Curated annotation (Swiss-Prot):
Keyword Ribonucleoprotein annotated: yes
Source species taxonomy: Bacteria, Bacillati, Bacillota, Bacilli, Lactobacillales
Name listed for the protein in its UniProt record: Large ribosomal subunit protein bL33A
PROSITE patterns cross-referenced by the UniProt entry: RIBOSOMAL_L33 (PS00582)
PANTHER family: 50S RIBOSOMAL PROTEIN L33, CHLOROPLASTIC, LARGE RIBOSOMAL SUBUNIT PROTEIN BL33A
Length: 48
């Protein structure tokens, strides 16, 4: 079952991206390096 998740910037805390994941295949939280427009650089985004 796929669920929608938000990716939150680890440094500024803003929710920048919306994505989906399969909870049965990936039960742990996702951590992805993505571009943060607020800080204008690539930061680690964590599932929230």
């Amino acid at each position: 079952m796929r669920v929608k998740i938000n990716l939150k910037c680890s440094s500024c805390g803003s929710k920048n991206y919306l994505t989906s994941k399969n909870k049965s295949n990936h039960p742990d939280k996702i951590e992805v390096p993505k571009y943060c427009p607020k800080e204008r650089k690539v930061t680690l985004h964590i599932e929230s």
